[in-house]
């Protein structure tokens, strides 16, 4: 039976549960449940702290896990990404009090508070910068005000929390993070149970990022229309009652699809319809 780790709480939890449910797997009905058995799919889900998931998967005790890329890298566990999931996107950056034009080199000799000490140490080491890294489990923004640290390194979403504490982010991103599906590094590629879950989830992720576009197109503009909607492999063309027209169906990315519809309409296409995709096996 496949053993899969899922975040038990936090920003990744609900999105992970939703994507697995859409992929046909059983959801837990009580947030206090630590395990859920899905006998019809031969999977057992374990609900764990997001920061611990890479450790369990890297040890080989669990086959797959959903966690954040930043958490997986900071863990130091021997894991590999199988799939980017497209949710929980954030950046991991240095920040310090506003009012100075900070550069990463300015961190030399300072105290840096973070919940991701390994990520920070690795980055500082790569830059040849010596600084003191202070590990905190959360709310690192307040550490400067309390005199514990001179700067921080933390996940940055909208930046609102930094502004509330009069902090400014600087330097390159240490890690562009999002939810990822991980496995132990070096896992066999021919594990059918593991691969089935990966492909199901991949189909949901693809469906969330694409939609199906249908439209009627005069044959006189068909070549130009197909340049706008080339589809995944090739669009589907179907004859219409009027032999001068064809029906076209093609997948297009959700991002920017309204612009695609505008282009088709300006070109002369009619009855342009966008439909959501629930799931697919497209890749």
Curated annotation (Swiss-Prot):
Q: Which InterPro entries match?
A: ATP-PRT_HisG_long (IPR020621), ATP_PRibTrfase_cat (IPR013820), ATP_PRibTrfase_CS (IPR018198), ATP_PRibTrfase_HisG (IPR001348), HisG_C (IPR013115), N-reg_PII-like_a/b (IPR011322), N-reg_PII/ATP_PRibTrfase_C (IPR015867)
Q: How is its activity regulated?
A: Feedback inhibited by histidine.
Q: Which GO terms describe its cellular component?
A: cytoplasm
| Catalytic activity reported | 1-(5-phospho-beta-D-ribosyl)-ATP + diphosphate = 5-phospho-alpha-D-ribose 1-diphosphate + ATP
Q: Which GO terms describe its molecular function?
A: ATP binding; ATP phosphoribosyltransferase activity; magnesium ion binding
Record keywords, A-Z: Amino-acid biosynthesis, ATP-binding, Cytoplasm, Glycosyltransferase, Histidine biosynthesis, Magnesium, Metal-binding, Nucleotide-binding, Transferase
Highest taxon listed in the record's lineage: Bacteria
The record's section on PROSITE patterns has: ATP_P_PHORIBOSYLTR
Q: What is the first-listed, main subcellular location in coarse terms?
A: cytoplasm
Q: In which pathway does it act?
A: Amino-acid biosynthesis; L-histidine biosynthesis; L-histidine from 5-phospho-alpha-D-ribose 1-diphosphate: step 1/9
For the biological process aspect of GO, one term held by this record is: L-histidine biosynthetic process
Its needed co-factors are: Mg(2+)
The EC number(s) given in the record are: 2.4.2.17
The answer, when asked if Transferase is one of the entry's keywords, is yes
Q: Where in or outside the cell is it found?
A: Cytoplasm
Protein's job: Catalyzes the condensation of ATP and 5-phosphoribose 1-diphosphate to form N'-(5'-phosphoribosyl)-ATP (PR-ATP). Has a crucial role in the pathway because the rate of histidine biosynthesis seems to be controlled primarily by regulation of HisG enzymatic activity.
Cited NCBIfam families: hisG, HisG_C-term
The entry sums up its family as follows: Belongs to the ATP phosphoribosyltransferase family. Long subfamily.
Name used for this protein in its record: ATP phosphoribosyltransferase
- Organism this protein belongs to: Rhodococcus opacus (strain B4)
Gene transcribed to yield this protein:
hisG
